[in-house]
């Protein structure tokens, strides 16, 4: 870039008129984009920043009416728009004027009580513009032009200017940090006002508000409350979850205990397996004395006890107890079935080994024998079977007996020696059919 042609005029003399264009500075471009974006000046880069935007004018009216509460010539937005358009007030002039007003509010509040808000706006903008655009610049505006823009004569403008400079003690220099602080405050006020007016905030408004210290503190406090609420809800949720699981466990345990107690009160409903009935002795009459017999239980009795313990453990569940009850009912009904003799030889599965006396034997049994004199299995005395009364359809050998002959000795009863009444068998078979096929 040729600085000589930029700084020197046609006659070769040094000229400062070229410094009126600062658009080539990168910081100037960033500041211009920031002002356009956050102060609602629009996205059109062709539009010049030579007047105040509507949101900025609203903030100026609100602030000056509060600072200068005099009822004479109260500042209106229409007047602000007219002056800013006629005098070409830039956003930087507006921010510098706000810095001056803030100084007056702290140094000379009496001056603000005497001047009207319209005059304060006019004179503060004029002093700020003169400070930014000194004499010799193209943007300079004389007092008569400011008076015409504000509808005030030149003498009144001169008086207002002298009083303003005296009240501020001619302290017009402003540090750039003060200017950017005012810019940040103005951006926050504009974003807040516009968001509240529309009912929603733009992304730019939210970014501006997040930069404000007051909003940061408020959002931080809000986040803390949200975190506390989330923790409280989490504790309540976990407590309720644990309470539900505990209640389910207690109810389940109570149901299981109740099922176990009911099953223990009715043990006869669950039949003993057929393998354990082989070692059962015939029931004796309650009025007769029962002799003491030696333990001649086969080795399979230990297996029966183990099966009984297993069955006792299975009864503890309600569903298992119900299944066992149904199965026992079926087995009890099937125990009365009498198959023909031919079927017994052909199908050994239909003739289970059992030692339980039949219905006829239980109803017609008499007193037991007096003394065990005959030798039994394993060289032990065996109690002879008592004489029993049978109906005419039952065989005389229907009761189980031990073979007392020494040459032909059996450790177990003859499975084919049991006989039943055919009449009862027919009735029980019909009952089984009704149980399996109710319809």
From Swiss-Prot:
MF GO annotations: cyclin-dependent protein serine/threonine kinase regulator activity; protein kinase binding
Subcellular location: Membrane
Domain of life of the native organism: Eukaryota
CDD domains reported in the protein's UniProt record: CYCLIN_ScPCL1-like
Region (Disordered): 283-302
Similarity annotation: Belongs to the CNPPD1 family.
This protein's UniProt keywords: Membrane, Transmembrane, Transmembrane helix
Mode of membrane association: Single-pass membrane protein
Bilayer-spanning residue ranges: 231-251
Organism: Gallus gallus (Chicken)
InterPro entries named in the record: Cyclin_PHO80-like (IPR013922)
PANTHER family: PROTEIN CNPPD1 (PTHR15615:SF108), PTHR15615
Any single GO CC term annotated in Swiss-Prot or TrEMBL for this entry: membrane
Main location: membrane
Coiled coil residues, start to end: none
Name used for this protein in its record: Protein CNPPD1
